C-alpha cells in the first residue's frame, strides 16, 4: 500500500449537503474535489438511488452549491450565474439532463419550496452595469462605517444587503417580503401554513453588531411585524413545529460567555418561552471535531414529524440526538456524524472514522451505502487518559507507519484551534502525512476544548495557564507511556488558538526543538481592534480590555513574553485572514528575529483563516510542504 502523501488531498472525494426526496427513494448531495490545474475546488451534484444503491451525476457543472427537491421530487438547482441572472434548472429522477426552469435577477443564496405555488428565496441584488463601472472606478479605496468592518472569507462588509422574497412558480414573478438594511438576518424559519416567518435579527447599534439578537414574527398576510424576544439570546437556528410554536437553540451567554453551550427552547408567538432541554444536557451544539478532510456545508439541526434533530459534540464524538413533542431526548447515532437526512423510518447520514472520510450510511441496518475509504497506509491511533487540573483527559498518540517499539522517533505536539473545538480519532490528513514519514504525533483536548461541558470549556481570563499546564502534563505523560518518543527531538505546532498556544509555549519553555505557529494570536491588545471578532472576543476571553485593565490583557499576550523565545519558530499566515490578522504573526516574527533565533515566515496571498482546511489546493500543498521541511530540518531522527 502506498504512503499517505501531501498531494493526496487532490484524490479525495468530499461528500456534503445531504438531502432526501419527498418519496424517500432518492438522496442528493455534493461531491467536491480539489482541482490542481485550476487551483480550486469543483462541486458536482449527485443523485443516489436508495433501492439500487447507485449514484448518478446530475450535471457537469463544477460549481453547484444550491439545490432542493421540489414538491414533485424534481431536483431544482442553480446551474450557473452571471452579472444579470442566476439560472435554476430542473431535473427529474430519470437519467436525462436538466433544463432551464427559471432565472432570477438576484444573487440567490437560499431556496425552499413552500408547496403552495411559491418558493421562499433569500438573495442580494446584482449590481447594474453602472454600479459595476462605478465600483471598478472606485476600487482604489474603501469606505468603512460598520463594526465589524470585514469578515474572514468575505472581506469588507460595508454594503452587503440581503432580502427575502416569494417567487411565484406560475408566472415566475418575484415579490419582496422584507429587506435588511440596518440589521443582519442571522436565521429564519417559515411555518407549515407558509403565512408566518420567524426572523432572527442582529441589530446594529450605531452600526456595531451586538451579540444578542431579536426574535421577530412577520405575518405574511397582513405584513405586521412584532419583536417577541428582544436582545436576550445568541441564536444557532430555529424551526416551527406543527402547533405554530418555535423551537430554537440559543445561548444567553450569562454563565460561560460567548463560548457558553446553548440549550433548546420553545416559544409561542407572543414570546412566552421555556427551556425544553434539561439543565444537565450540557453539550456543545454542532460538530466541532477538527479535520482537514471535509468540505462545504453540513446540517446541524432539522425538524420533521414532530421531532427536532440536532448534532452535538459530546466527549470526542459528534452525535445525533432527537427531541420529541413530549420533550424526551433520544440518542439516535453515535460516532462522528457529519451530515444527515431524515426519512420516516430511517436516517441517512455522512460519517467520518479513522480510515474513512465522509461516507454515506443508514441507521436502520447500520450499513455503508457509499464508501469513501482512504486507500493509503495509515498510522495507528492509540488513546489513553491522563490527569491534569482535577480532570481526567483523553490523549491521543498517532504512531508511525511500520512502527518499531525498539526505535525512537521525532515527535510533534499538535494543538487544535478554538479553543472550543476538539481532536478525535477521525482521519486527519496532515497528521497521517507525518505518521507516514516516521513521526509520532501526540494531541489532546486541554481545558477550553468542547465536548465536556461549559465548566471545562470556560477558560476566560486563564489563557496560557490551565491550558498550558494540561499540554505540558500531557506531553510528560506521553513520554513516560511511550519510550519511543525522542524527547530531544520534539516539535510543537498549531493554528488559530493552536497558534496562540504555540506562541505561548515557546515563550515559556525550551523543551521543543522547533515550532510552527499558524494563523495565530500574539497580542490581545491589538487583536481587539483588527480581528473581525476582536472587539467582543478579546474582552470576553481575557476578561479585560485595553483601557480599563490593559495589564491583564497584556499579561495574557504571548508577545509580552517573546523576549524569552529561544526555540526556532516558523510562522504561516494568510494576508486575507481577518480572524487572526497577519500583523499578529508579524509581531512574534519581529521579536524572535531580534532575539537572534532562527525564524522565518510564509505569507499566503489571497488565502484566509481557512487555509489548512479549504485553502486553494496549491496553497494547501505548499503550506504542508513548508511545515514538513521546517520540522525535518530540525527533528528528523537518524539511526546512529
Where are these regions (language model features)?
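Predominantly five- to eight-bladed beta-propeller fold
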Residues: 42-43, 124-165, 213, 262-265, ...
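A short beta-strand motif characteristic of beta-propeller blades
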Residues: 4-9, 54-58, 99-102, 175-178, ...
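Non-catalytic accessory segments flanking enzyme active sites
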Residues: 17-19, 122, 143-144, 150-151, ...
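Cap/lid segment of the alpha/beta-hydrolase catalytic domain
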Residues: 375-488, 495, 529
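Active-site-proximal cap/loop segments of hydrolase catalytic domains
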Residues: 446-640
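Short loop/turn segments that connect beta-strands within beta-propeller blades
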Residues: 50-52, 92-95, 168-172, 219-223, ...
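Short, solvent-exposed loop/turn segments at conserved positions within beta-propeller repeat blades
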Residues: 37-42, 81-85, 155-161, 206-213, ...
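Conserved beta-propeller blade repeats
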Residues: 12-27, 61-78, 103-118, 122, ...
